[in-house]
Structures are given as structure tokens and as C-alpha cells.
């Protein structure tokens, strides 16, 4: 790298040294030999610049080309992905519009079925509660009637005992015993 730099500087500064050595002023004619030497020096300069920098220039532009191609590929891939996503979203929107009515109908049907099921369960629970209440009421009435009968019998027996012990004489007792023996058959 240093060698190329030194050589480039020498090629650039050599014409300056040549012109400095000339020192004289020419007459009014066109110095074709001077122009010729300058053209040759300029050609040598450009040839040297091209010779020593062509690898760097070629690699620079090759790198730029590779970077550009890579960016173009990424851009093309991103565009393809975006187009695919666009088509996918467009299809989903079209499908959503088509299935919206069907989904609403299904939801309404499901809601109606659920409503019917809840009403049926509520009716079943209501009937069960009503039947249980009626059964409980009947059982309570029967129990109350039984208790009343038992109480009535106990009160009747007690009243009969009191009446029999106070008002019953020995002739009445003998008559009752005969009736008891005849009815029971002992």
C-alpha cells in the first residue's frame, strides 16, 4: 500500500519538476513539443493511476454491485411476502363477510337452544319443588290428623275413665263385663 502511494506521488510530481526546469519564456508560437510532452505525461499519469488503482476500483464496484443485488433480493422477497400477506388478508376479509351471516345465525340458534334448555330446567325444578311442597303438605296434614286422633282418643278414654269411675255402679259394671265377654267371646 505504501509503495503504491509513493509511486503515485512520484508520477504526479514528476511533471512539475520537468516544467520547473524549463524556466524560459517562449515566443508567441504554439509549443507543440511541449504540448506533446504534457500529453504523454498525462497519458502516463492516467495509465499509472489506472494500473495501480484498478484492483481497488474493481473491488469497490464489485462490493457495491453485491450490496445492491443483495438489497434488491431482500426488497423482492419483502415485496413477495407483503403481496402474499395482502392476498391472505383480502381472502380472510372476503371469507369473514361471507361467514358473518352464518356465524350470526349459528349464534342465534345456539342462544335459542340455550334459552329453551334453561327454561326446561327451570320448569323441571319448579315442578319438583311444587311436588315436594304438595307431598310435604299432605304428610304434615296426615301427621296433624293422626296427632289429633290420638289426642282425641286419649282425651275420650280419659273422659270415659273419669265418667266410669264416678258414675258407674256395680250393676253397670257387671252388665259391661257381660257385654264385653259376649262381644269378645272369652
From Swiss-Prot:
The keyword Transmembrane applies. Belongs to the ATPase B chain family. The chain crosses the membrane at residues 5-25. This is ATP synthase subunit b. It is found in: Cell inner membrane. InterPro entries: ATP_synth_b/b'su_bac/chlpt. It is a single-pass membrane protein. The keyword ATP-binding does not apply. F-type ATPases have 2 components, F(1) - the catalytic core - and F(0) - the membrane proton channel. F(1) has five subunits: alpha(3), beta(3), gamma(1), delta(1), epsilon(1). F(0) has three main subunits: a(1), b(2) and c(10-14). The alpha and beta chains form an alternating ring which encloses part of the gamma chain. F(1) is attached to F(0) by a central stalk formed by the gamma and epsilon chains, while a peripheral stalk is formed by the delta and b chains. Keywords: ATP synthesis, Cell inner membrane, Cell membrane, CF(0), Hydrogen ion transport, Ion transport, Membrane, Transmembrane, Transmembrane helix, Transport. F(1)F(0) ATP synthase produces ATP from ADP in the presence of a proton or sodium gradient. F-type ATPases consist of two structural domains, F(1) containing the extramembraneous catalytic core and F(0) containing the membrane proton channel, linked together by a central stalk and a peripheral stalk. During catalysis, ATP synthesis in the catalytic domain of F(1) is coupled via a rotary mechanism of the central stalk subunits to proton translocation. The gene is atpF. GO terms for cellular component: plasma membrane; proton-transporting ATP synthase complex. It holds the Pfam family ATP-synt_B. GO terms for molecular function: proton-transporting ATP synthase activity, rotational mechanism.
Amino acid at each position: 500500500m505504501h509503495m503504491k502511494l509513493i509511486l503515485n506521488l512520484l508520477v504526479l510530481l514528476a511533471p512539475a519538476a520537468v516544467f520547473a526546469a524549463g524556466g524560459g519564456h517562449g515566443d508567441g508560437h504554439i509549443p507543440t513539443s511541449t504540448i506533446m510532452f504534457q500529453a504523454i505525461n498525462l497519458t502516463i499519469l492516467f495509465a499509472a493511476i489506472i494500473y495501480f488503482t484498478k484492483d481497488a476500483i474493481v473491488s469497490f464496484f464489485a462490493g457495491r454491485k453485491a450490496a445492491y443485488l443483495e438489497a434488491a433480493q431482500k426488497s423482492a422477497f419483502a415485496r413477495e411476502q407483503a403481496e402474499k400477506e395482502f392476498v391472505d388478508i383480502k381472502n380472510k376479509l372476503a371469507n369473514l363477510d361471507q361467514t358473518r351471516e352464518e356465524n350470526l345465525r349459528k349464534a342465534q340458534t345456539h342462544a335459542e337452544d340455550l334459552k329453551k334448555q334453561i327454561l326446561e330446567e327451570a320448569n323441571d325444578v319448579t315442578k319438583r319443588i311444587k311436588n315436594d311442597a304438595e307431598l310435604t303438605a299432605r304428610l304434615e296434614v296426615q301427621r296433624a290428623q293422626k296427632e289429633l286422633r290420638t289426642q282425641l282418643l286419649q282425651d275420650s278414654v280419659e273422659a270415659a275413665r273419669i265418667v266410669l269411675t264416678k258414675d258407674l255402679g256395680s250393676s253397670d259394671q257387671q252388665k259391661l263385663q257381660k257385654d264385653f265377654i259376649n262381644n269378645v267371646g272369652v
